[in-house]
């Protein structure tokens, strides 16, 4: 489990306003990050589009970050800020 910075009140409110799927992806990343999009899909059993949208929503409110996977630069790994 990765150590993350505490969430600001503004980030908490923004997260609360997101769809349940984005909150679910956030929780998965909270406990199992870093993960690729494919690994998140496998963990959550959500569709690829739903996970993609959830990751976009989480990036918009600036609570997750990503970088290319070292072994496959076509994929990104996602983790909490």
Please report, for each region that a protein language model flagged, where it lies by residue.
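Linker/hinge segments immediately adjacent to helix-turn-helix/homeobox DNA-binding domains
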Residues: 1-11
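Short, cationic-aromatic polyanion-contact patches
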Residues: 9-22, 36, 67-81
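Hydrophobic residues on short alpha-helical segments
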Residues: 22-29
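Residues within the helices of the helix-turn-helix
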Residues: 27, 38, 56
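Short helix-capping/turn signature of helix-turn-helix
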Residues: 31-32, 46
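Short acidic, hydrophobic short linear motifs in intrinsically disordered regions
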Residues: 34-43
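Short amphipathic alpha-helical interaction segments
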Residues: 47-59
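Glycine-centered, phosphate/nucleic-acid-interacting loop/turn motifs that mediate DNA/RNA or nucleotide
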Residues: 62
């Amino acid at each position: 489990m990765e150590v993350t910075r505490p969430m600001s009140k503004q980030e908490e409110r923004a997260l609360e306003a997101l769809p349940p799927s984005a909150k679910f992806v956030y929780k998965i990343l909270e406990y199992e990050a870093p993960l690729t999009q494919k690994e998140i899909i496998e963990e959550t059993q959500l569709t690829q589009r739903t996970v993609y949208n959830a990751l976009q929503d989480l990036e918009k409110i600036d609570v997750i970050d990503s970088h290319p996977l070292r072994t496959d630069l076509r994929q990104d790994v996602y983790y909490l800020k």
